[in-house]
Each structure stands twice: as structure tokens, then as C-alpha cells.
């Protein structure tokens, strides 16, 4: 199993690479790529960790050597948020980066499962889909927007609020991956209940958690370490499913049946070919249903922005 990390010299990429070097199954290959010249050195640094995961690093304009034979590609390349920016301010720079890298994936490893971490995910996933479609290699079961950070944040915040162990809590988060499009299904957590005010406040905290980190880092970065952990969790789940493990479920932002929007984050049963089944989001509370209805315009506009970037 070969996993490639694109953007591997950045804050998320290095954290993700460290976790994958430690946790990928024995015999896996890990391939690191970034435009930054430090990247082969990051791979050498990680190669000293005693795990049976082979690692190589590549830098420069051409990602091809890193992508050859990849089964899973995780893209974290791009610029990070600074205070006062929202995820859509990133669009102008990151759209071009994602387009370029996905064009290289389409040529070199078109059958790979691709996880997009680069923000704004609501839009960059649509860009990736359109690029793959133009190249004639798009498979909607193999393209994912990685929204796992919203889930691990939800698990942490719910556990704190309700005095549970974070490992005992698993929150489904649906919709998209920014602001109001992030919708944790708090009403579906077994053995936990919330007042309406608690649900509203907690939902807002989860939606704004990225900004909490950006402000706390005072201009020195955004959520890199927790995002690295979230991306590793998603990537490792995908690898386990591709290797034939049954019953692997993760939420991610994928093209579905278009019931809510063309792309939508929902629970997915993963399998040997990527998405095996898009699972139901279940029964929503009145607050959740209202929040879902209210976000769809925003989500659809985000998606349209990505489609137009490639097709206009």
C-alpha cells in the first residue's frame, strides 16, 4: 500500500507524515512531496523512526515521482489562514495549487483514492472533481474532502461538556467543512442529551473552532497538529478498508445523490474501491433540520465557485 502526502513540508503535512510513518501497516510505502526544497530532508528525518514503513521525499515543481503507484493521495498543500481571514480568502491561492496537483494525479495515478485537506474544502473538492472529469478519470467513490477535524473536535468538546471520556464519544458531522455548513448531529449521540441552548452554543463552537486556533496562535499559523491527527485517522481508515477490512465507517465530503447538494459530508462505509455505501444521516432534531436547510445555499455557492474555476 503506497500513500502519498502532497504538501508534506507544511505544518499539516509534517504532522501527518509523522503519524503515518508510525501507524501505517508494516510494508507500506510513504511518499512525501512538496515544492519546498526541505522535503527530501523531512523524509530522511522520519526515516530514522524504527517502523517498517519505507519513506521517500521529493521536491520541486513535478509531483510525478511521488505519485507513481500511489493507492492513496492526501493533499494538504496550500497557504494557511491568518487572523481576519476566513477559509474563502484562501480560495484565490489554493484553487490553483489543487488544480495543478490533481492534474498530475489524473496523469500518474488516476485510480488512487484522493483526500483533499486543502481549504476551502467545500470548493477545492469540486475543483478536483472537475479536473478529474476533464481528464476522463473521475470516480466519485474515490474523491473525498477530509472533514475528520470537525468530528474529532466535536468528540472532544462533547466529552468536556458532559464529563465523558473523549474516546467514548463519536459524533456524526454532516454538511460541509466551513462555518455554518458544519453540522454536528448532537441529537444522535447515544446516552447524551443537550438543552436547546447547549446544542446551539456547542454547534457554534464546533463551527468556529478553526478560528479559535488561528486567533490563539496570534498570526503564527492555523490548526496544523489537530488537522494532521484528523487526516491521519481518515487516511489510515481508508488504507484499512482498501486492504479488505470490513465495517470501516468515516464521515467525509463526497459526491452523493445530490439530495442536499452535489457534494455533502455524510457517514460512509469504506471498502476496497473507496466508498462502498453512502449511509443515511438518520433523524434530525428540529434545530438540526433548520440548520441543514439554512446552510444549503452557502454550500451550493461554495461548490459552484469550484466548478466555475475549472469550467469558465
Curated annotation (Swiss-Prot):
Q: Give the GO biological process terms.
A: malate metabolic process; tricarboxylic acid cycle
EC no. given is: 1.1.1.37
UniProt KW keywords: NAD, Oxidoreductase, Tricarboxylic acid cycle
Query: CDD domains attached here?
Result: MDH_glyoxysomal_mitochondrial
SUPFAM superfamilies assigned to the protein according to its UniProt record, in alphabetical order: LDH C-terminal domain-like (SSF56327), NAD(P)-binding Rossmann-fold domains (SSF51735)
Where along this sequence does the record place binding of NAD(+)? Answer: 7-13, 34, 94, 117-119, 227
Protein name per Swiss-Prot or TrEMBL: Malate dehydrogenase
List the source organism: Salmonella choleraesuis (strain SC-B67)
Gene name, per UniProt, is mdh
Amino acid at each position: 500500500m503506497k500513500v502519498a502526502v502532497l504538501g508534506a513540508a507544511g505544518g499539516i503535512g509534517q504532522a501527518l507524515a509523522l503519524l503515518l510513518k508510525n501507524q501505517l501497516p508494516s510494508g507500506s510505502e510513504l511518499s512525501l512531496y512538496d515544492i519546498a526544497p526541505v522535503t527530501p530532508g523531512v523524509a530522511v528525518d522520519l526515516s530514522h523512526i524504527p517502523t517498517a514503513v519505507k519513506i521517500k521525499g521529493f521536491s520541486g515543481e513535478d509531483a510525478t515521482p511521488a505519485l507513481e503507484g500511489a493507492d492513496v493521495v492526501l493533499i494538504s498543500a496550500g497557504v494557511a489562514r491568518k487572523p481576519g481571514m476566513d477559509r474563502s480568502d484562501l480560495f484565490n491561492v489554493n484553487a490553483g495549487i489543487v488544480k495543478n496537483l490533481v492534474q498530475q494525479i489524473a496523469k500518474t495515478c488516476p485510480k488512487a483514492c484522493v483526500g483533499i485537506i486543502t481549504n476551502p474544502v467545500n470548493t477545492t473538492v469540486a475543483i478536483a472533481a472537475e479536473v478529474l472529469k476533464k481528464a476522463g478519470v473521475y470516480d466519485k467513490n474515490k474523491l473525498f474532502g477530509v472533514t475528520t477535524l470537525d468530528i474529532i473536535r466535536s468528540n472532544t468538546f462533547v466529552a468536556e461538556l458532559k464529563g465523558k471520556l473523549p474516546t467514548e464519544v463519536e459524533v456524526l458531522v454532516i454538511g460541509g467543512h466551513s462555518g455554518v455548513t458544519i453540522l454536528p448531529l448532537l441529537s444522535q449521540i447515544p446516552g447524551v442529551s443537550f438543552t436547546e441552548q447547549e446544542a446551539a452554543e456547542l454547534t457554534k463552537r464546533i463551527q468556529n473552532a478553526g478560528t479559535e486556533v488561528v486567533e490563539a496562535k496570534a498570526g503564527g499559523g492555523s490548526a496544523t497538529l489537530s488537522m494532521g491527527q484528523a487526516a491521519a485517522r481518515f487516511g489510515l481508515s481508508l488504507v484499512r478498508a482498501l486492504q479488505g477490512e470490513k465495517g470501516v465507517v468515516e464521515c467525509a465530503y463526497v459526491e452523493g445523490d445530490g439530495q442536499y447538494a452535489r457534494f455533502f459530508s455524510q457517514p460512509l462505509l469504506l471498502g476496497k474501491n473507496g466508498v462502498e455505501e453512502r449511509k443515511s444521516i438518520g433523524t434530525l432534531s428540529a434545530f438540526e433540520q433548520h440548520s441543514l436547510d439554512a446552510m444549503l445555499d452557502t454550500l451550493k455557492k461554495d461548490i459552484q465557485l469550484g466548478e466555475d474555476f475549472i469550467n469558465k
